[in-house]
Amino acid sequence: ASRLVANVCLYGKHSNSRRYQRFRSYRSYFFRAVQAANAPIEIVAVNDLGNIKTMAHLLKYDSVLGILPNDIKPVDDGISIDGKVLKVLQHRDPKDLPWASLGVDVVIESTGFFTDRDKAAAHLEAGAPIVIVSAPSAGADATFVYGVNHQDFDRSKHKVVSNASCTTNCFVPMVKVLDDAFGVEKGLMTTIHAYTGDQQLVDGPHSDLRRARGAAINITPTGTGAARATSLVLEAMKGKLDGTSLRVPVPTGSITDFVAVLKS
């Protein structure tokens, strides 16, 4: 089994509390996905500055995904899951994390603070062989969408890789199927997307006035780079696609609509 670190370096006192909550959820989703797939992955540690008791509670109880059947409780140095302790680290700087001594194979960088290649590479300095950024990553060695180009992964040269965005993972397989069968000349994507942690739950200040409106009671138009980012996965699509996003008042469940001009 691979020894994997789910690195979720959350900043409990950071001013961007919306982002803090958003990425705490991602850690729970990753843990649940590993369990559901019965994957041969050992999650060695989580890096989080938050309260361990609260973290254990949020892992056990999820408002969207429900309650995990596992016996989950906080302990002195981590979270006990069915009697096995998941170590909780609390470092602000990724360079200080003990990845080498823990013998990890992969670090999942899902904080949203270290998405750029230069910042995510701090995990390499700390001893991690490979870093997977769970978001678009500027300067990443490669961007992969499973089922489209994951077979191009090369461990010898891909040290910091991006898994792109959720919208890109939904959108790109559709584009590939159409392009392989008919050829895509150009296209426009619209994603009808569940609201996210980067919106206000009720009306409040935001740098984007549209996202300042209450997420649960508004349809919010916003931008998305998912269409343009497609060329990072399918190079032939460079300059051919664009898109927009509508955030709708549901906590989970999103769809992507794609209109294309085909070659045949």
List PLM regions with ranges.
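N-terminal Rossmann-like NAD(P) cofactor-binding subdomain of oxidoreductases
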Residues: 3-4, 8-212
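C-terminal substrate-binding/catalytic lobe of Rossmann-fold NAD(P)-dependent dehydrogenases
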Residues: 181, 186-190, 199-264
